[in-house]
């Protein structure tokens, strides 16, 4: 029987924290050794962290990365486990690489062949692609080494490893960023890939937040029939160990002979001998964790992104302007779940236009969450501004200027608290507002992290409803769900005076931003032509605001951040 004990170290590194990442790696190494593992797989670029971006241009960063790989190798002395460790190989150029480490030695290095250069990825800016396959032999078992995008490539190098080299297992070191629906997409894809090539797969994904990116984990082991026999937790660190029966590969190939007729490329191959299989005791039962519903998935991604941004950047507490509306309520909920109620501060900043209802809703929410609040009215300061500007504004009617003044006063208050106490200001704008420019630059956009900037308004409501249901009680007051959304910057104001109903707006935005449809195609789906053009024009005209917005968690297939690179100076208008 060909039985391989595989351990996947689904861990949360911090970019540039070589010492901290090494400590995590050593802890995982000890666990794998105690469990009698034959193979231990880490995520992509685990030692330096991912994505390193322009740190790749610093020789000192590359040298530290190499130094800590050697340090890690020393900790494998006299151990029986073979390790695949993600690092940067930078001898004659820079490569996204995996080192094969055992018993104090680096036995070989694999260099990533398929470098993604789309969406949030810029790997061709920093890395040279590898040109050689790497096969690790552990006893009579052959393991092919790949890194992230290598297995997303439809054919190679998976085909050459499985068909050409006859590997029993493809190990994949991954740092695959999250978007809504990505866990099930990834699970189905790897299942299909294993089935098509009749090869088992051990996929180790990173977990945690890095600036706007979230890595969701979901590491898995798939057998040669395409069955996911172990599926890790989402958004949590976990060390997974699986006993993998690799005799299944031959059984599947005999029943389904398609692979005999598949063609492969002629990559050069390096084979590394990593000793014998280990004597094993006991058996590690596989665990397939269930996938969460859509709202829970998004909620946990937002928690992960916020928690890690706060902690990894040295903050302890955050502050939020509480308006009594849905957006600030959801941000407060996410912050409380991510950081604990003692680390979240709420500020109510009422004006003469703020309703009693809004104040009560904000106070009820804060009480339900158990967070401390402060009330700092803006009315006197607002009147002082108007008095100061009276001469300059003489002869002009009140307009959006006076509305934006209120938002900017509130932004000043929050930033003053941030400066005085070291609290990180969380902005509360959603994707619908960021797309259309329905936000005030240096006002409600002022802050350090925009938690829900990639969440459409309709999804803000859905996540809020799910949260109350999950908690089994009304944390977010019902009145916040049912009252018309409003900025309360003048009497009787509602969002729908300037925007289409959010159910309409969000679908137009999704089709235009994420699906890339033209206005004509969107209108053909039943939307009013003028409304579609108005929305796309708002998107174009407000690029300057988005360029100055705080970063926030990416949860969609295309967010306003690393994967949205529109010019500000732009006279192109969508035709219809």
From Swiss-Prot:
Residue span, CN hydrolase domain: 4-246
Stretch list, region Ligase: 292-576
SUPFAM superfamilies: Adenine nucleotide alpha hydrolases-like, Carbon-nitrogen hydrolase
Record-listed E.C. numbers: 6.3.5.1
GO molecular function, one term: NAD+ synthase (glutamine-hydrolyzing) activity
Record's keyword terms, sorted: ATP-binding, Ligase, NAD, Nucleotide-binding
Main function: Catalyzes the ATP-dependent amidation of deamido-NAD to form NAD. Uses L-glutamine as a nitrogen source.
Protein name listed in UniProt: Glutamine-dependent NAD(+) synthetase
Organism: Thermotoga maritima (strain ATCC 43589 / DSM 3109 / JCM 10099 / NBRC 100826 / MSB8)
Phylogenetic placement of the source organism: Bacteria, Thermotogati, Thermotogota, Thermotogae, Thermotogales
